[in-house]
Amino acid sequence: MADSSPDSCFKGGKFSAPGFRFHPTDEELVMYYLKRKICRKRLRVNVIGVVDVYKMDPEELPGQSMLKTGDRQWFYFTPRSRKYPNAARSNRGTENGYWKATGKDRVIEYNSRSVGLKKTLVFYRGRAPSGERTDWVMHEYTMDEDELGRCKNPQEYYALYKLFKKSGAGPKNGEQYGAPFQEEEWVDDDNEDVNAIAVAVPEQPVVRYEDARRVDERRLFNPVILQLEDIDELLNGIPNAPGVPQRCIPQVNSEEELQSTLVNNSAREFLPNGQQYNRPSSFDSLETAEVTSAPLVFEKEDFIEMDDLLLIPEFGASSTEKAAQFSNHGEFDDFNEFDQLFHDVSMSLDMEPIDQGTSANLSSLSDSANYTSDQKQQLLYQQFQDQTPENQLNNIMDPSTTLNQITSDIWFEDDQAILFDQQQSFSGAFASPSSGVMPDSTNPTMSVNAQGHEIQNGGGTTSQFSSALWALMDSIPSTPASACEGPLNRTFVRMSSFSRMRFNGKANGTPVSTTIAKKGIRNRGFLLLSIVGALCAIFWVLVATVRVSGRSLLLKD
């Protein structure tokens, strides 16, 4: 049996500090303590003694335990004794009573295999079967036969017992059997610890790394323990070391020595919102091969000049295939989707060149874009006065030409981005659409509505003159009165007008009189059917009334 080592925490049946307790689990009791006892192997701590628990009363057993910690549970190794020589039943009788098995035996498993059996015993004082039950309980741990066969040359068979006393009758689940803490037992702890070994904490030496060549072990630095004398020598030798030569760093003029890659890099005041004068502006990104300088013209915030928005058209076949691109992609990203939809509509229609008689001069349009809104109105008024009376009357009767001339003025009046392609507006005009689509001016439905409106007003000439006059007044550029009159809303109106043209164009080639006649016939037929249905209902009501009255007369007779 192994004894406790001198430096162990368990000495003389006690632990060297409070809180340490012997509280093993069922698996630990069977697989370590009981198995090692049967196989005669060494135990690290001698805490369980060999005692025959059936030869003593329960009150005498705590004094026989090797644990003197004050805990209220004790452990013992007991050789298995037989009640009868050729029987497997143990003799559990004592001098003043007996231990009786109670409850159900529990199997102890380890690694999914059965390694032992746990049995609960209760002590009865007196002779069976009229003994008096006490609060002394004992757990018996035995090893399984298969697990016992794993031991080599077992000499003697033991059973392990755990003894404790309950606080009263009935089950006491969760009851603690540890020793209560007594402060008086640990007051003279320092005086009693005479054999304590003083543990000297070693000082951490200062390690110095010296440069060394590579050796076979492939270590580049060799650690060398540095003593205090060496440190003093090093500190004393520092003032004698040659000093570092003081070198004056020459002063350098950054303007002369440093070269800058920036153009026109000179000290000046930062002025925001600057634009070079007489510089051609375009939405297309430009790649300049040489650097030019020009005076700066400063503008007010949130103001865009007409020159910044105007594009000089380039005639070619590509004008109908790609839309205008902006140089600053982050400035007009919100209008790219609508602009693409507008170009898709223009791509679906055929383009044809504009006649010289009906088209405006391109040079005059580009020059007029440089004028202000007041100058443009004055120019239009002069052009209107210079015309002959016949041309003035034609322009009033057909305001489409006047509207075409001032469309660009309305579109560019607001300080927003251009939402349509100027190349398409200058290079060609919309031709007559294919079958199924007709222009808005040739729509028969619109002509019929216009005729009906003229009849209601009492005269076609006066109504047409007033409508043309109102169209001319509406075309005069002015500040929008509400958000719905902005350029973005007009863009949606123009885009939606194409869908209206296609919808109204489905009635191409169909006379309006035929449609009106069909509607009148349908209305008359519906009215006739309603009258016939009402007459039939009245007839059936009369017939039913006559039948009922006839039956009542027959019953009276």
UniProtKB/Swiss-Prot annotation:
<dbReference type="GO" id="GO:0045893">
    <property type="term" value="P:positive regulation of DNA-templated transcription"/>
</dbReference>
<feature type="DNA-binding region">
    <location>
        <begin position="115"/>
        <end position="172"/>
    </location>
</feature>
<dbReference type="GO" id="GO:0070301">
    <property type="term" value="P:cellular response to hydrogen peroxide"/>
</dbReference>
<keyword id="KW-0256">Endoplasmic reticulum</keyword>
<keyword id="KW-0804">Transcription</keyword>
<keyword id="KW-0346">Stress response</keyword>
<keyword id="KW-0805">Transcription regulation</keyword>
<keyword id="KW-0472">Membrane</keyword>
<dbReference type="InterPro" id="IPR036093">
    <property type="entry name" value="NAC_dom_sf"/>
</dbReference>
<keyword id="KW-1133">Transmembrane helix</keyword>
<keyword id="KW-0539">Nucleus</keyword>
<keyword id="KW-0010">Activator</keyword>
<dbReference type="GO" id="GO:0003700">
    <property type="term" value="F:DNA-binding transcription factor activity"/>
</dbReference>
<dbReference type="InterPro" id="IPR003441">
    <property type="entry name" value="NAC-dom"/>
</dbReference>
<protein>
    <recommendedName>
        <fullName>NAC domain-containing protein 17</fullName>
    </recommendedName>
</protein>
<feature type="transmembrane region" description="Helical">
    <location>
        <begin position="526"/>
        <end position="546"/>
    </location>
</feature>
<dbReference type="GO" id="GO:0000976">
    <property type="term" value="F:transcription cis-regulatory region binding"/>
</dbReference>
<comment type="function">
    <text>Transcriptional activator activated by proteolytic cleavage through regulated intramembrane proteolysis (RIP). Transcriptional activator that acts as a positive regulator of AOX1A during mitochondrial dysfunction. Binds directly to AOX1A promoter. Mediates mitochondrial retrograde signaling.</text>
</comment>
<keyword id="KW-0812">Transmembrane</keyword>
<dbReference type="GO" id="GO:0010150">
    <property type="term" value="P:leaf senescence"/>
</dbReference>
<dbReference type="GO" id="GO:0031930">
    <property type="term" value="P:mitochondria-nucleus signaling pathway"/>
</dbReference>
<keyword id="KW-0238">DNA-binding</keyword>
<dbReference type="GO" id="GO:0005634">
    <property type="term" value="C:nucleus"/>
</dbReference>
<feature type="domain" description="NAC">
    <location>
        <begin position="16"/>
        <end position="166"/>
    </location>
</feature>
<dbReference type="Pfam" id="PF02365">
    <property type="entry name" value="NAM"/>
</dbReference>
<dbReference type="GO" id="GO:0005789">
    <property type="term" value="C:endoplasmic reticulum membrane"/>
</dbReference>
